[in-house]
């Protein structure tokens, strides 16, 4: 799990400009990390590129926390 989490965390830090210690499994992209809807779209695209997978819109809408993203990716890679 650490491998996926670390890669997801790096993308979030790079995209949102937040501190690494703010990125926890429980952190909400919007409420805790200050992302807006465009940021979320860009994060999903970055996850797709990094992990070479496609995240359908209906799945992307369910990814609200860092943990959601990590778990979703782990189930598919």
Swiss-Prot record:
Pfam families: PP-binding
Domain Carrier: 2-77
Compartment(s): Cytoplasm
PTM statement from Swiss-Prot or TrEMBL: 4'-phosphopantetheine is transferred from CoA to a specific serine of apo-ACP by AcpS. This modification is essential for activity because fatty acids are bound in thioester linkage to the sulfhydryl of the prosthetic group.
Higher taxonomy: Bacteria, Bacillati, Bacillota, Clostridia, Thermoanaerobacterales
Key words, A-Z: Cytoplasm, Fatty acid biosynthesis, Fatty acid metabolism, Lipid biosynthesis, Lipid metabolism, Phosphopantetheine, Phosphoprotein
Intrachain S-S bonds: none
Major subcellular site: cytoplasm
Family: Belongs to the acyl carrier protein (ACP) family.
Entry's Gene Ontology molecular function annotations: acyl binding; acyl carrier activity
GO cellular component terms attached to this protein's record: cytosol; membrane
This protein's name: Acyl carrier protein
Modified residues (O-(pantetheine 4'-phosphoryl)serine): 37
Domain of life of the organism encoding this protein: Bacteria
Pathway entry: Lipid metabolism; fatty acid biosynthesis
InterPro entries for the chain: ACP (IPR003231), ACP-like_sf (IPR036736), PP-bd_ACP (IPR009081), Ppantetheine_attach_site (IPR006162)
GO BP terms: lipid A biosynthetic process
Described purpose of this protein according to its UniProt entry: Carrier of the growing fatty acid chain in fatty acid biosynthesis.
PROSITE patterns referenced in this protein's UniProt entry, alphabetically: CARRIER, PHOSPHOPANTETHEINE
């Amino acid at each position: 799990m650490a491998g996926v989490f670390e890669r997801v965390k790096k993308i979030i830090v790079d995209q949102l400009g937040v501190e690494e210690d703010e990125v926890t499994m429980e952190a909400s992209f919007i409420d805790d990390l200050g992302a807006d809807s465009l940021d979320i779209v860009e994060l999903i695209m970055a996850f797709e590129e990094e992990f070479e997978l496609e995240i359908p819109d209906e799945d992307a809408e369910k990814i609200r926390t860092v943990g959601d993203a990590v778990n979703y990716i782990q189930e598919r890679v």
